[in-house]
């Protein structure tokens, strides 16, 4: 019987391993496995954390990556946020936003609803939040002071996005809409100052920059400067997003820095319909975590390091046709739910065959 049990276990393992990777880098980007939290801190002796207004505000933002803290500058004097504010010479009462890397932004005035709108409801922030579930990714283009370089960089970004869109039918999962370019002109800096601040930009850069954002407002890699943009950096980063999660990509690239993003239950339900599973489901998160842990157990370092030799883009997605606009016929999306159903059917058949075999052996 021990021999039959061992065979049974090996068969089950083979079935689930044969199912392959269930998720793409893009899909993992929607998860909360590693979430950048922005803290909006109201530091005020008179503010009461138990006030119904603050509780309503907290509930309203439960599903996005903005958290509210009500702190008393006297009773909470040793709180890291209060100490950080004091080190910056901030006088209380004050309302500050703390980034995941502990950078601090001081607001003028204490109108919490206006501040909330500045953080999560800027024109471009709302646009991206609406687009992310339906598109491949966003190429966020920040204009610099040099108009000529701005024009050149935008041409390269648009071409790279078009090239990726041509490759999308050959990627592990089909996405209906390709990358979208969202430019930020120098005239947008005031209205988008907090979105830009979250990306580390506090003034108009000398040269244009590009950020590739996907999933739940995640950045893959780092900011791309003018030289990197003209050398195909946008294409390289976008290609990584289309790969499956076992492509050898460093975990820190798949779960990169996030911008503050308005995300609610409607966003979650809409995404679930599109990808075929709930990215916030504990079982899905456990499976994603298992895959990522396996991929990064060996050779993990403290810094982000892209190793081109671990990802053969031509082999993964097919050769890129230079200047070609042809696209392949799109195939139905290989949803994880379908893969699981097929695996369970195969498992049922195997168990039935093993059972019949054991019964036959006993009779003889």
Label the model's feature ranges.
Residues 7-15:
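Bacterial N-terminal signal peptides
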